[in-house]
Regions:
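Extracytosolic ligand-binding ectodomains
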Residues: 2-6, 13, 27-392
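Bacterial N-terminal signal peptides
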Residues: 9-21
Length: 392
């Protein structure tokens, strides 16, 4: 029996109207974001912070942009670049994502870069901090930081503030090399001396034997870079070796004093001076609101990885608004270039030439505030670009 014989004209009219009402919803496809993060392993705190911040942003701002629903597909790469590449390919080919984002470590971001280029898919780097990353694909935009930004600043600050002899301890991979090179250049240019230089393995490092070498060198301070998540272990062994009682100060980029882990480090962290892009103690109202909302949602304070994820999803939302919800990769990248906004960390922008972030870098000192440890900012360097690129 045909449909016409089964239904009355009135019923057919209702059915057609129903189909017309449904059609626009079907045509309004969701925009998918492939979020690749280390949710397990030694970098898991990075993944957790970024994932939390993205969820918070979407709770606050909704899950619809330019009339299209935003769908985030989270994948755990364990900070292993082979996993990253496989997951990125699956997300692009099978899930048809319009963005890939996250990337807890530099090797992960680099592993995905050729796929971003081939697919013309924007790759939003929310964590990895090596300068070269944005040069590996015209489709990469970064909302985190570079190690050169903060390490350059702390090198200049140290030599101007009575620190003459420094021993360095850095993780032996690309960001650690960037941090070391930037610090050394600016510290020694001001007359400072490097009295000991140690590189430690990235995976599961035992800092104890290296810390003894630091202690024996008797520097004024130790310049330390270890990735987010390892700072707590480093400070534990620093205290066990008695370096906190020996007068050897800890200085460095802020990764070692991540707000997410700071309270667990104990009083050994007091007095550490670092240069970084964000502190949970940043005094702006927008940051106070961000910290309060994050604490309410997750029971802990946000760190610099959280704010980088928060700004990363904001960048995606704003780019989609500019394109009217269109997901052409070239149009999205053009929309992101030069974008400026007020972040919980302070004013930030995307350099239209390099697609890297331009932001304030703050000198902070670990102090106890209301019984908790915080990175308290006391000096600001405004609108800092990546020095690794400004030389070119």
């Amino acid at each position: 029996m045909s449909i016409g014989k089964m239904l009355s004209p009135a019923a057919i009219g209702v059915a057609v109207a129903g189909l017309l009402a449904i059609t626009p919803v079907r045509a309004q496809e969701s925009i998918k974001i492939g979020l690749i993060l280390p949710m397990t392993g030694g970098q898991a705190s990075t993944g957790k912070q970024i994932d939390n911040a993205i969820k918070l942003y979407m709770q606050q701002n909704g899950d619809t942009v330019a009339g299209k629903k935003i769908e985030v597909i989270l994948k755990d790469d364990g900070a292993l670049p082979d996993n990253t590449k496989r997951l990125a390919q699956e997300l692009i080919v099978n899930d048809k994502v319009s963005f890939i984002a996250g990337f807890g470590v530099t090797p992960a971001a680099l592993a995905a870069a050729p796929l971003a280029t081939q697919g013309k898919i924007p790759e939003i780097v929310m964590a990895a901090g090596t300068s070269i990353i944005t040069e590996r694909s015209p489709y990469i935009v970064r909302t985190s930081f570079t190690l050169a930004q903060s390490s350059t600043i702390i090198g200049e600050w140290a030599v101007k503030n009575g620190i003459k002899k420094v021993a360095t301890l850095t993780s032996d991979y690309a960001p650690g090399n960037d941090a070391l090179a930037s610090f050394k250049e600016h510290f020694t240019a001001g007359g400072g001396e490097i009295v000991e230089e140690v590189k430690v393995p990235l995976a599961n490092p035992d800092f104890a034997p290296f810390l003894q070498r630091m202690k024996d060198a008797k520097p004024d301070a130790m310049f330390v870079f270890v990735p987010a998540g390892q700072g707590g272990n480093f400070m534990k062994q620093y205290a066990e070796r008695g370096l906190d009682k020996s007068g050897i100060k800890v200085i460095g980029p802020g990764d070692v004093m991540d707000d997410d882990l700071l309270n667990g480090m104990g009083d050994a962290a007091l007095g550490a001076v670092t240069a970084h892009i964000y502190s949970a103690a940043h005094p702006s109202q927008i940051n106070k609101d961000f910290v309060a909302a994050y604490k309410k949602a997750y029971g802990s304070r946000p760190g610099f990885m959280a704010v980088s994820g928060y700004d990363g999803i904001h960048l995606i939302y704003e780019a989609l608004k500019k394109t009217g919800g269109k997901t052409d990769g070239d149009a999205l990248i053009e929309a992101m270039k030069g974008m400026k906004w007020e972040s919980p960390r302070g004013p930030i922008s995307i350099d239209p030439e390099t697609r890297d972030i331009v932001q304030n870098v703050y000198i902070r000192k670990v102090e106890k505030v209301d019984g908790e440890l915080y990175n308290v900012e006391f000096q600001t360097f405004e609108a800092v670009k990546d020095s690794g690129k400004t030389k070119k």
